[in-house]
Amino acid sequence: MNKFAPLHPKVSTLLHGADYNPEQWENDPDIIDKDIAMMQQAKCNVMSVGIFSWAKLEPHEGVFNFAWLDIILDKLYAAGIHVFLATPSGARPAWMSQRYPQVLRVGRDRVPALHGGRHNHCMSSPVYREKTLQINTLLAERYSSHPAVLGWHISNEYGGECHCDLCQNRFRDWLKARYQTLENLNQAWWSTFWSHTYTDWSQIESPAPQGEMSIHGLNLDWHRFNTAQVTDFCRHEIAPLKAANASLPVTTNFMEYFYDYDYWQLAEALDFISWDSYPMWHRDKDETALACYTAMYHDMMRSLKGGKPFVLMESTPGATNWQPTSKLKKPGMHILSSLQAVAHGADSVQYFQWRKSRGSVEKFHGAVVDHVGHIDTRIGREVCQLGEILSKLPEVRGCRTEAKVAIIFDQQNRWALDDAQGPRNLGMEYEKTVNEHYRPFWEQGIAVDVIDADVDLTPYQLVIAPMLYMVRDGFAGRAEAFVANGGHLVTTYWTGIVNESDLCYLGGFPGPLRNLLGIWAEEIDCLNDGEFNLVQGLAGNQCGLQGPYQVRHLCELIHIESAQALATYRDDFYAGRPAVTVNAFGKGKAWHVASRNDLAFQRDFFTALSKELALPRAIATELPPGVVATARTDGDNAFIFLQNYSAQNHTLTLPQGYRDCLTDAAVSAPLTLSAWDCRILRRHA
């Protein structure tokens, strides 16, 4: 077998659980025993404990109370339930803010925060670092060998930035280490524009609405600095935990669509990835677009650790209370969306939270146990049903996703694109564009890794780089080597425009990729909303492109150098100009798509490439609209998750040799999937 090792030797199956906050119920101690009995009923085998417990653990400075936590961990262990034990830095006690105001953040507008909320501490504060070191050390010394503890949940949803004097000084120190001299910094930031040249390090301030926000290199470096800050703070939290027991793995929960930090760098501090997923199901009539978006983020979380299974640390079995509408999941959707995570590489399904809070800001957030106090509810029964399903899938734990396709979704590129001021200030739609390129593979059941531009390209047959506006040093050389050795690279409009400082490449776009792509991009036309062009395949083109395909937003005007045109624009003054090209390069090919084309184009183009490269599919059958197949494998067996994201039943024909993972019965064709249904099949690999 070829599986990843479990998170902990105690773990032999998939995990099922939730955030558990027993400190909220200290005035009703009978609830704890009732909760644990219901956890067993739902086949939960893990709980995240202590995430926001600092005020309970240290009610007064230097006065610690661990007795309640001792009881909780012992009771959970006795019931066969493991624990991700949290460090409590996500929210600090009021006494700390009152006595040490330097732990409070200062906003971008330079206004200090008051005590309240969460995730708003200054990561530069020596006091906060001292206090987190102290509480983490005590937790590690007391619990790192507790038999219930599987690993550490570091803080919670790190986010945000601080602009206090301490952070300004750390930022300047970070810049000195990066650039060495002010001359180098001024050159990288092109600060001669508008006479913004710096003559002393003390003149540099973080971006501010009443100060400097026009230097894009500064803005980029501020993002990078904040990533370095949180990574350093995370390592600071981890150090005493590893000192007590180096074998316990550590994680912190990431978030979807998150903008503040570069998760690729923060991931290096962690042993495994966990994240919080809250799709707004049933917002649109067609669920497939959201299902595709969510699948892409699952794939990114898996890719952050080279394909290692991740933990779905938070989700909701019902509705959230912080999104615009608190829409209930239709019957079956909770199980379907949870199994989607497992299909894409999760070895757990967990919720926020186990029991609904009685008061405060998330009292109406979905949970397993509602205010009624039991799980004989629609949601409770679905959670129990999912627990039963997960308990029957021990073979899936640790299985791999074998992706021969990678799509680059690069956070530094995202920051630079959004800040560039042109060519489309209405929004460059980077995430949406990446997902539009991901979708044809998801629909066909072709596995995809979602990577950043610094990841090794050699494991893949096909790499797609939508709008890789920023090409950092080294990427072009690696891309050329990848294609020369037989790989296929697809780029798009607005690629190869700037370097890592957001300085435009001179000598013609796409900059250092010009030789590989065999084109020169002279101009780019931004279409008004509601304005469209068309792209038409040339007769006999090697992809079989036909069309016309509708084009929106962006049309790049390119010249052929060594490439071959496959399709051209049909309208406007650039009618007849190349719109899709391919350049033979060594043993491989470099493709370029010069315009933002419709889904029909994406399907035709990437289906052609998939056939040319004989990319493996999860299952060799035609899938009806709304039905997708996702596979994991242990090397001997493949586990196929057939998912129906529509409100209609669908019937499909299966090849021979499949068995149902839950019943071990042979699966005969045709197979019918009910609305919001998921079937898990096994075949010999």
Q: Model regions: which residues?
A:
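Short, acidic/polar
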Residues: 25-40, 132-138, 255-265, 330-338
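Polysaccharide-binding and catalytic clefts of secreted carbohydrate-active enzymes
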Residues: 97, 109-296, 300
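Short, well-ordered coil/turn segments that N-cap beta-strands
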Residues: 11-16, 43-45, 77-83, 145-150, ...
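Carbohydrate-binding surfaces of carbohydrate-active enzymes
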Residues: 201-204, 235, 247, 267, ...
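Aromatic-lined substrate-binding rim segments of carbohydrate-active enzymes
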Residues: 33-41, 48-112, 237-244, 469
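The substrate-binding groove and active-site-proximal loops of carbohydrate-active enzymes
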Residues: 16-26, 52-67, 114-133, 155-162, ...
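Conserved, mostly hydrophobic/aromatic
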Residues: 18, 39, 47, 76, ...
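N-terminal carbohydrate-binding accessory modules
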Residues: 1-46, 59, 74, 396
